[in-house]
A protein has these predicted regions:
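FIC/Doc superfamily catalytic core
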Residues: 1-238
Length: 238
């Protein structure tokens, strides 16, 4: 991994290195059955938080609802694709959006939208696909691959929300895809928490002005929570 500090501050170690060490310690120590159970719990937790963050509170009480099932299928597709080493592409984005935001068919929007975040500059529909492709090219290029997962998340999340490729459900799709960047580097699925919503809004608005530091820290904490869930699973029955 790169020697790329998240916040240059006189030599303090970047959080990404500490997370890597915790993940490495778990390799070979967590029995396969426990790992599978822990991963499934993280998937379900990520979907629930995604739906809560986007106003679908009822899904928390009904894990067999079509909305929950669709989002869980979308997250499984994200995890499988990322873990196989494939790159994130427009086709995957559209399919994940279709699964997680019914009745959308995954179509790119054809009309202008009003911004829902301060400092956001929503694109005209004719620029959406080219701007999305530019973002993906950067994330999968040499610079993007040289970043810690939390740093890639902090670039992806606000830019996708600002591009807003769909008429609705952009935040939901952006949030589900955070797990692409964690799973691509061997981490489990991740999610923000509903209780963080107000703070996250402010951090996203700062990121529109290229101040991504707070979001990097936020996503580092999310990765830490996911690893902690695996560590707890490893301690079961010890």
């Amino acid at each position: 991994m790169p020697e790329l500090p998240i916040h240059p501050d006189g030599g303090r170690e970047a959080p990404g290195y500490a997370l890597e060490r915790r993940l490495t310690r778990l390799e070979g120590l967590l029995p396969a059955a426990r790992r599978r159970r822990a991963h499934q719990g993280l998937r379900e937790s990520s979907v629930l938080e995604t739906l809560r963050l986007t106003g679908a509170d009822a899904a928390e009480k009904d894990r067999e609802s079509p909305l929950f099932d669709g989002a869980l299928e979308a997250l499984a597709l994200i995890e499988t694709t990322a873990s196989s080493g494939k790159e994130l592409d427009l086709g995957l984005i559209r399919e994940v959006h279709r699964l997680s935001s019914p009745p959308s068919g995954g179509e790119i929007r054809t009309r202008d939208l009003a911004p829902q975040f301060q400092n956001a500059r929503i694109l005209s529909p004719r620029f959406i696909e080219s701007r999305l492709q530019n973002l993906l090219d950067w994330l999968h290029g040499d610079s993007g691959r040289g970043m810690f997962p939390a740093e890639r998340m902090a670039l992806w999340f606000p830019r996708f929300i600002e591009i807003a490729p769909f008429e609705r459900g952009n935040f939901r799709t952006a949030h589900l895809f955070l797990s692409f960047f964690s799973c691509a580097d061997g981490y489990p699925p991740v999610s923000l928490k509903f209780e963080e919503a107000e703070a996250v809004r402010g951090e996203v608005e700062r990121a529109f002005l290229f101040d991504t530091g707070p979001l990097v820290q936020r996503f580092s904490s999310a990765l830490g929570r996911a690893i902690e869930a695996l560590e707890s699973a490893g301690g079961e029955g010890a």
